[in-house]
Amino acid sequence: MARFSILDLCPDLVEKAMNVQNGLVSMQSTLQLQAQKDINDPCTSIDSTTDIMSNPANDNSDYLLDESVDDERSESTSSKDSKSPCSNSSDDKKPSSPNDKPPFSYNALIMMAIKNSPEKRLTLAGIYDYILTNYPFYRDNKQGWQNSIRHNLSLNKCFVKVPRNFDDPGKGNYWMLDATCEDEVFIGGATGKLRRRPSTLSRARMDAYKQYGAAAANLFPYFNPGLPPMPRTPFITTPPTAFLPRPMMPMPSLAPVFTQPELIQMYLNQQQGLFAKLQ
């Protein structure tokens, strides 16, 4: 009996199948190279590589205090876009101009204005003058930022409104820094926003606890969490007769529980009785 193969009968089909298989292998290798390129490329979006690599969050010990209100939506968007790591190298080498938008939040600008004033207090007009004098960017961009300054003065607890004295000529109240924020709040160098350090009182309490905590636990063992609770002697050993519980009443008997065969038999008996009555 003669032997033959599928290659002899349909050589064109076998050739097409081989071409398809080779194309799939080539496509798979191309996708792997593209994925590796996307991982190494800093311009690749985070969303496209979240299943491959993840970035750990930065752990900052300082507490972020700044929640600035920004009424300049278009300017804030453009500033975020300008900080993209995929920007052109010529843009990175471009020197910063005094007319560029400063990298500080509105709360940070207010704090700098008040701290640099001789009396450590300023009116709203004085804060405007400080910003316009030191940051020329806001001279040509007056839309929105003055409203943002007013909103942040009212919302941030670090800024306190002080009424003007009766013998002080002029208009408007003064704004000062709260005493608790003057030493504990600073401007972050990387973010340009207000951040809060741990308070001096909190650090002093923690240091005192570390130094005297063990000695206090030995002197007052009742406050030591490691010891078991002390037994308490009850004031009344036996309850009064008037408060003794009444005797329990007998519970009513429950309905009998039948099994499935018993229920079927009861049903058949009932049907037979009804059938006998009909006859």
Swiss-Prot record:
It holds the Pfam family Forkhead. GO terms for molecular function: DNA-binding transcription factor activity, RNA polymerase II-specific; RNA polymerase II cis-regulatory region sequence-specific DNA binding. Residues 101-196 bind DNA. Its main location: nucleus. GO terms for biological process: anatomical structure morphogenesis; cell differentiation; dendrite development; embryo development ending in birth or egg hatching; nematode larval development; neuron fate specification; non-motile cilium assembly; positive regulation of transcription by RNA polymerase II. Residues 42-102 are annotated as: Disordered. The keyword Cell membrane does not apply. It is found in: Nucleus. Keywords: DNA-binding, Nucleus. Residues 42-61 have a biased composition (Polar residues). Disruption phenotype: RNAi-mediated knockdown by injection into adults causes almost half of their progeny to terminally arrest at the larval L1 stage and the rest developed into fertile adults. Simultaneous knockdown of forkhead gene pes-1 causes 8% embryonic lethality and 80% of progeny to arrest at larval L1 stage. Residues 64-73 have a biased composition (Acidic residues). The keyword Nucleus applies. SUPFAM superfamilies: Winged helix' DNA-binding domain. GO terms for cellular component: nucleus. Residues 74-83 have a biased composition (Basic and acidic residues). Gene3D superfamilies: Winged helix-like DNA-binding domain superfamily/Winged helix DNA-binding domain (1.10.10.10). SMART domains: FH. Transcription factor. Plays a role in embryogenesis and later development, perhaps acting redundantly with forkhead protein pes-1. This is Forkhead box protein fkh-2. It comes from Caenorhabditis briggsae.
